[in-house]
């Protein structure tokens, strides 16, 4: 099919001819219009090839990569800086190479995305913030200063600088220092600036003439700035192998404990000590034991950054190169000036043309809670009360109910500041230049984690951070692969759906192997539709792009374009209880995960929604809740929650009065919040308008309360997943079999018109059989092979549709190509029957394996039939020649070619090349080019074993429960939904996350067969 011109594309999307381009806005074409672009979609929608720039970059090498990508159907090139990138980041020589990339891509009709920084997280400008704008660096609130005194003793000394709160508690045993203290010279002016070198954590102890010692925790890469007392006797540093004492964010509650209870309380209620008005701290400890006086301070502290432009070349991730103060719009403006405007001077004429936009990565607050100079002022404006008197209690442990509510107010305020002062200005800057801001947050797979870092502790609110982002995304570092349950891609897809964006990005893609295709399909069916093909690294031997990768590239491009046009069609909204997370409600997270998995496994499509959406910017009318994509929700499911916003409660009541369905599943909220969490609305909420299911499970009763499903299988299967989008006059469904068994079902689909199979592999469209029903549904026979995906469209049959799809299931085997083959893996040919490389003792082989077989056909070939070559099992990229005639490459089942025109009577020669990328061509995910997730790496929940026979709910599911329960108490073998604990020490555990580090299922490689020539 000829490439579409820009004019033709505008004809396909006439409503947007004068608006933003189709890749930036939700478009709803007709079936005929979608069919015109299916075989050759607009290239902006193409699979992204992630070019990892590590070491010395040359135009010659980069040009070879661009040429290779383009020759294999690649459309989009992403610049990604890696360790010791040269020329130096943002230097004239570096920007000249960037311009070269843009120019070469433009010549070929390709597009470019630019990584926003030189490493990650975004915000440190390759070290320029530390170098030129340290006053705009990231700041935090930490409980980092401690003074241990004996019971009954009195102390008096100058208050440590920048103190916000003070508390005292019974002292815990101090961790032993790893080495003797090193003396630090006492500064003549009293201003100590001491740098903690990379690789260690430290304590700096300042002792005065009275023997009173204050210990300050210092993280690797941080500079300690303090004013020491005039009577200072000594200063020394010690290295702490166990990390900084205390520090971190508030204890428990919203953030989860970060570094313990802020000050190492040994038990009992902490004593809150008022800040002295005169700056001189005076206190007498109660009798009995030692006391730890903890000073909660605001200071410059950065999340660790990996600066690929630094002197260590990104090898170390520490706090040396500070990120900006994300809560300060002035800092964001400087960041734009340092980085984005530097690019604009060189390639700005291609902004919104060849350059589609900017990518960000994992911007967050790691190990401390946010501070900015205007925090207290902004807090009082929004909440109506002063935060500072509560700060000490926020960090002390145990928490009082009042301090937990104050902490939730604090999270509410700073998460909004993060959105408004960093993310929104970056997106606005991009949109003003017809580009988009694209990226993912940190820990999206772990929403709340009392024992460590999480989305809520580090970034406040997933939904607020991504509220204005043009292309929200996820990071598939190692969380997704066969045998792993990881549903968290749904939250990024939901962020795009509810905010009116068509694309959802994924940082770590699959490769060009069958396992890579599983990773793509797994994400596509969960709504992620802008996928990476794993990186082009500096070393050619680690290049994840195969010479014959065009089949995978075209499959990804066609499928993700089809999944980006039209309007999302889920009718169910699953409430995401971020407000309850701020109050430390971990059960809310557990139940949210459980319901998400059960809905997916039982073909009930949904989007996550949050309080801001339901309570504010969704339109509410007689049809239901309408999001910014124009999608309408007919039901809202609310999992276990502690709190509900008054605005949400009021609108849910109106929604129910209009005929909408509201279902509370699990523990119902007992607190209603209007302006502040500190002072909630009196009384419990009236939920009489809703259905309440206390079990915390998707039961038959819950299903009965939901709208009529758009997909219903005649026989249940928790291994068939789907997603649904609506066109102007038709419906688009993607189905994916996540098991290794062939599954056949009759499926009832909402829609009217001709049922069609849209083949993303070759871009063809075929009519399918279907029986229309009077209720506006169609009964469709659906067979899905092992890990197979299919795209079904219902609507008018396009003019460019082909004949009905041919199946070889009933074909006649004309020749069985059994016996010996000539097999060449490397230099020495073998004569052997077909077996895996592992069975041949070549399990580590990478590259191209050549197979040759001569076979005879009957003297009289069947008349009126087509001849098909079926390779059987391959599990890698396969390319064939029959009697010297080339055929296209195939990268996944089924490995079948129509070879009618190449076969002759008598002797024939078949040549097969099987190719696999070298392991290590990309990060994580398993499979060729990736390598499995390491034990202890972050990952998805490992499936607890083979699904039960027939893929139906197991017998031990409680009566009335639809599918297997999910949770720590679930029995082993309880189906795909069970087992939330870590499988191999991984840290993923949040919404769709779970135990991690499980390697992908082992798959034998090579041509295994059986190989058949079939007449059909």
Located regions from the model:
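Aromatic-lined ligand-binding clefts that engage carbohydrates, nucleic acids, or primary amines
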Residues: 194, 746-747, 855-883, 891, ...
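Short, surface-exposed tryptophan/glycine-enriched loops
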Residues: 228-231, 856-857, 895-909, 913-918
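An acidic-aromatic loop/edge-strand motif
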Residues: 127, 142-147, 157, 162, ...
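Mature N-terminal segment immediately following signal peptide/propeptide cleavage
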Residues: 30-76
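Carbohydrate-binding surfaces of carbohydrate-active enzymes
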Residues: 23, 28, 46-47, 60-63, ...
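Short strand-turn-strand beta-turns centered on an Asx-Gly dipeptide
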Residues: 205-210, 881-888
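Active-site-adjacent "subsite" loops/lids of carbohydrate-active enzymes
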Residues: 122-183, 187-189, 193-201, 205-231, ...
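Bacterial N-terminal signal peptides
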Residues: 7-15
């Amino acid at each position: 099919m000829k490439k579409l011109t820009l004019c033709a594309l505008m004809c396909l999307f006439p409503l947007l001819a004068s608006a933003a381009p189709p890749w930036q806005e939700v478009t709803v074409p007709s079936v005929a219009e979608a069919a015109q672009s299916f075989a050759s979609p607009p290239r902006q929608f193409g699979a992204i090839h992630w070019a990892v720039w590590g070491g010395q970059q040359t135009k010659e090498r980069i040009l070879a990569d661009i040429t290779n990508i383009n020759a294999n159907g690649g459309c989009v090139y992403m610049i990604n800086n890696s360790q010791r990138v040269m020329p130096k980041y943002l230097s004239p020589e570096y920007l000249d190479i960037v311009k070269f990339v843009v120019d070469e891509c433009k010549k070929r009709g390709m597009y470019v995305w630019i990584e926003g920084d030189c490493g990650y997280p975004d915000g440190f400008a390759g070290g320029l913030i530390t170098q030129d704008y340290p006053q705009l660096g990231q700041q935090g609130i930490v409980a980092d200063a401690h003074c241990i005194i004996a019971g009954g003793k009195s102390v008096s000394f100058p208050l440590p600088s920048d103190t916000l709160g003070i508390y005292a508690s019974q002292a815990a045993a101090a961790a032993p220092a790893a080495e003797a203290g090193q003396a630090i010279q006492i500064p003549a002016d009293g201003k100590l600036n001491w740098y903690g070198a990379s690789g260690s954590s430290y304590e700096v102890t300042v002792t005065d003439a009275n023997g009173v010692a204050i210990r300050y925790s210092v993280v690797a890469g941080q500079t300690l700035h303090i004013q020491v007392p005039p009577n200072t006797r000594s200063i020394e540093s010690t290295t702490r192998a166990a990390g900084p004492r205390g520090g971190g964010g508030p204890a428990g509650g919203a953030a989860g404990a970060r570094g313990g209870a802020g000050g190492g309380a040994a038990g009992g209620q902490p004593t809150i000590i008022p800040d002295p008005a005169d700056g001189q701290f005076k206190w007498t400890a109660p009798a009995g034991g030692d006391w730890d006086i903890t000073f909660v301070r605001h200071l410059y502290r950065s999340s660790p950054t990996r600066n690929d432009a630094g002197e260590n070349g990104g090898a170390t991730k520490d706090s040396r190169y500070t990120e900006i103060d994300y809560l300060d719009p002035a800092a964001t403006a400087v960041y734009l000036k340092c980085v984005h405007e530097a690019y604009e001077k060189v390639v700005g004429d291609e902004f919104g043309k060849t350059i589609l936009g900017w990518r960000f990565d994992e911007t967050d607050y790691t190990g401390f809670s946010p501070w900015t100079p205007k925090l207290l002022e902004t807090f009082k404006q929004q909440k109506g009360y002063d935060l500072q008197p509560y700060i000490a209690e926020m960090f002390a442990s145990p928490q009082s109910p009042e301090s937990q509510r104050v902490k939730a107010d604090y999270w509410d305020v700073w998460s909004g500041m993060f959105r408004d002062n960093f993310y929104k200005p970056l997106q606005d800057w991009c949109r003003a230049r017809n580009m988009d801001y694209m990226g993912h947050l940190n820990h999206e797979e772990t929403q709340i984690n009392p024992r460590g870092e999480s989305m809520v502790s580090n970034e406040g609110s997933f939904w607020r951070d991504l509220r204005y982002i043009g292309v929200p995304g996820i990071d598939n570092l190692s969380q997704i692969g066969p045998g792993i349950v990881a549903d968290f891609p749904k939250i990024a897809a939901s962020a795009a759906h509810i905010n009116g964006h068509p694309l959802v990005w994924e940082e770590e893609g699959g490769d060009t192997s069958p396992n890579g295709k599983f990773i793509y399909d797994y994400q596509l069916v969960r709504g992620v539709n802008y996928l990476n093909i794993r990186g082009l690294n500096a070393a050619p031997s680690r290049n994840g792009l195969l010479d014959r990768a065009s089949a995978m590239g075209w499959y990804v491009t066609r499928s993700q374009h089809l999944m980006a046009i039209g309007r999302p069609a889920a009718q169910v909204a699953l409430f995401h209880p971020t407000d309850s997370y701020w109050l430390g409600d971990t059960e809310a997270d557990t139940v949210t995960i459980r319901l998400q998995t059960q809905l997916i496994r039982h073909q009930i499509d949904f989007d996550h929604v949050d309080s801001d959406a339901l309570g504010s910017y969704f339109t509410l009318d007689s049809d239901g809740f309408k999001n910014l994509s124009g999608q309408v929700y007919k039901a809202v499911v609310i999992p276990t929650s502690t709190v509900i916003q008054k605005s949400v409660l009021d609108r849910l009541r109106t929604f129910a009065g209009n005929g909408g369905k509201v279902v509370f599943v699990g523990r119902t909220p007992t607190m209603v919040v209007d302006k502040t969490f500190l002072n909630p609305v009196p009384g419990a909420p009236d939920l009489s308008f809703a259905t309440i299911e206390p079990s915390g499970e998707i039961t038959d009763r819950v299903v009965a309360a939901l709208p009529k499903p758009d997909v219903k299988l005649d026989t249940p299967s928790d291994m068939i997943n789907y997603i649904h989008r609506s066109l102007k006059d038709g419906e688009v469904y993607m189905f994916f079999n996540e098991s290794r068994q062939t599954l056949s079902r009759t499926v009832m689909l909402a829609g009217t018109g001709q049922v069609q199979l849209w083949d993303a592999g070759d871009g063809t469209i075929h009519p399918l059989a279907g029986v229309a029903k009077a209720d506006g549904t169609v009964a469709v026979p659906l067979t899905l092979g092992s890990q197979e995906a299919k795209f079904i469209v219902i609507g008018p049959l396009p003019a460019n549709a082909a004949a009905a799809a041919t199946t070889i299931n009933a074909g006649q085997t004309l020749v069985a190509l059994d016996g010996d083959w000539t097999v060449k893996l490397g230099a020495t040919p073998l004569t052997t029957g077909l077996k895996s490389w592992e069975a041949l003792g070549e399990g580590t082989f990478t590259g191209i394996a050549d197979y040759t077989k001569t076979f005879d056909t009957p003297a009289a070939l069947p008349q009126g039939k087509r001849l098909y070559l079926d390779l059987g099992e391959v599990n890698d990229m396969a390319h064939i020649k029959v009697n010297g005639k080339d055929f296209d490459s195939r990268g996944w089942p089924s490995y079948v070619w129509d070879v009618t025109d190449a076969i002759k009577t008598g002797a024939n020669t078949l040549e097969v090349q099987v190719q696999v990328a070298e392991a290590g061509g990309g990060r994580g995910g398993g499979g060729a080019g990736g390598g499995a997730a390491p034990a202890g790496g972050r990952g998805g929940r490992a499936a607890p074993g083979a699904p039960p026979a027939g893929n139906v709910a197991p017998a031990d599911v409680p009566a009335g429960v639809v599918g297997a329960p999910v949770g720590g108490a679930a029995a082993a073998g309880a189906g795909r939904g069970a087992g939330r604990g870590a499988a191999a020490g991984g840290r993923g555990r949040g919404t769709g996350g779970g135990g991690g580090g499980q390697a992908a299922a082992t798959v034998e490689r090579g041509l295994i067969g059986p190989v058949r020539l079939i007449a059909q």
